[in-house]
Amino acid sequence: MLIISHDQVADPKIFMNEVFNKTQEQVSLYAIHYTLNEANNKINYGCNFLNRVLREDTLLYSEDNRLKQLGSYLYHPEVFLRIQKHWNKRFEHARYFEEKSTICEDNPSNQGRYLILQQAIQQACLGLIYVFWEYQSSYYSLPYLLHLCEQFSDVPKIIYPKRSFQSQQMYSRLCHAQYNLNEKIQENPSESDSLKAEHLTYKFIQAARKEADKKLEELKKLHLKN
């Protein structure tokens, strides 16, 4: 995570691409960015994500002490309800997209199915990240979201590619579904491959639900107790 005093690298996508290119494609970073003003404003209003990360993680470098003092983690029933509502809405979206991918059509679009499945996985990831971290990402790349989820869960392993070419191709199609649909208009993945991706997505969403339910039970005890 970077907290910076200016806006030049506010967009994590640009920064991550620059690092990737300047290291001859040897290093991939998955960065969370705040400007100094954003961070200080959030700390003022009791941001549990920043309070947790800045308190628990290792500080690699700090230029000065312009970042405000952290408060304590905020436990409150209303905080729990906010987390629970956020998860329920994300899970609702994930199930919606996943169910839409199963509709039988006379003229199916397998490229379109990958895009729908990508949306389903993204929504489940965004929900998990909020449940575990209370963080709302402003960047929605599938590899990025899966990597964030990997910091607290093994669920991304369901989606990550295995050694086979078919598995790696399926993962690539899920990650680049929007680009493929717009740019590779002549390419038509097989229906059997897209159905396998659909099955993986279903497994991922169900596993994410179990992880979220377990974490929500823990959070409920903490927030209601305090």
For the regions a language model picked out, list residue spans one by one.
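Short beta-strand-to-loop capping motifs
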Residues: L2-D7
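Catalytic core of pol beta-like nucleotidyltransferases
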Residues: V9-N226
